[in-house]
Amino acid sequence: MRSIQSPSSHAAEQESFFSLAALQVGLPLMWASPRPSPNLPDKEDSSIGSADVVRTGERLARFAPLLAQLFPELEAAGGIIESDLLAAPRLQEALNMPADTGTLLVKADHALPIAGSIKARGGIHEVLEHAETLALQHGLLASHEADYRVLAEPTARALFSRHQIAVGSTGNLGLAIGVMAAALGFQAVVHMSADAKEWKKERLRKRGVTVVEHAGDYAKAVAAGRAAAEADPRCHFVDDERSLSLLLGYAAAAPRLARQLVAQGRRVDAEHPLFVYLPCGVGGAPGGIALGLSQIYGEHVHCFFAEPTRSPCFLVQMLAGTPELAHLGAHPSVYDLGLDNRTEADGLAVPRASVLAAEVVRPFLAGVYTVNDEALFRHLHLAATTEGFRIEPSAAACLPGPAMLMGTAEGRAYLQREQLEHHMARSTHIAWTTGGLFVPDDEYARFRVRGALTS
């Protein structure tokens, strides 16, 4: 296997091992988990087992006929919200990935309908679960075998209209939850941070969603939303930092991906390792997906989270409790390390990670790498020019993953330690592009110009 180097990488940065000093000054880097565990999350003592993921998938299937009725764009798929697993040979070549390093595929959540991002998975699931609970409690659904299309009828909408669903968001989660909640008739409120893009706020308002703007960052928007919800017994707050329902909604993507891999003839085993690169904000989406994949593939899947260099909250949480960060307590933020949480990747601009997601993935997460904004725009432009993928900056964080794994000393040491070096030619690399479908044309054009200028 040859070492590869991303078009965005700098040799001096790529050759070094992880260091806290490099993290604190915002250098792009790779951190490999020191002890990936063979004790994977489907053990009897785990609070989240594969049966929970199966039940989540069953719930999404029960709602599919209703979703097909509510959203014409879902009719062809029978109400199932899913993205394609796409070959990307031109992008692989542009990323300097020779054939002996494996095959690159793109999980195209940037094109997911309704929300246009990965947040359609977890966010919509939690809204549907809450609607199901209310409908069962009030006798609108006799059982899980009922026809869920009754939830589009006036009686159900009258019930839902007396209840509120709220969320704190930098943008995409708010879009997913706001659009779905409003479509069912709920009062929908989205608390948005200063990082949120104006077009996302306008898209919500046009769908009847109340947008509450906050001057602070993501964490402050979530805290404000949580406090407001606690004062209203009829308000269900979708808590991105603590929600098991969200996490399971994301985890339900794993069995679907497994079926797509089988359909494409891609094996995953000791001789055919699977590497997955997932953009990470608070951690719920990549955490849920990593959980689901680990339940299916065990030690043969290697999930790496991607974060902005100035907002690496999940990596900071992974380092919590180490001697270097022990003085910061159990739940440190990027501010504690002197970082400013400023990035064009609005969906990843999070100062403090979800403790729930961190503890779920800690036993099996392969690693975390960081990417600067310049590289995000460069890779966004590369995805467009090679494959025609229309992604937003946050989604582009997944694309430097192979280079960070195979082109850094830290990444190569991980491959050597896990005895993967001689299996790379038969490996599969999945870059999970997390959003972009609904980015306005003028905004996307600016992204492309900035990416072209840095290429």
Curated annotation (Swiss-Prot):
Gene3D superfamilies: 3.40.50.1100. Keywords: Lyase, Plasmid, Pyridoxal phosphate. One of its GO terms (molecular function) is D-serine ammonia-lyase activity. The keyword Lyase applies. Transmembrane segments: none annotated. The keyword Lyase applies. InterPro entries: D_Ser_am_lyase, Ser/Thr_Dehydratase, TrpB-like_PALP, TrpB-like_PALP_sf. Its cofactor is pyridoxal 5'-phosphate. It catalyses: D-serine = pyruvate + NH4(+). One of its GO terms (biological process) is isoleucine biosynthetic process. Its EC number is 4.3.1.18. It comes from the Bacteria. The modification N6-(pyridoxal phosphate)lysine is found at K119. Pfam families: PALP. NCBIfam families: D_Ser_am_lyase, PRK02991.1. Belongs to the serine/threonine dehydratase family. DsdA subfamily. PANTHER family: D-SERINE DEHYDRATASE, THREONINE DEHYDRATASE, MITOCHONDRIAL-RELATED. This is Probable D-serine dehydratase. It comes from Polaromonas naphthalenivorans (strain CJ2). The gene is dsdA.
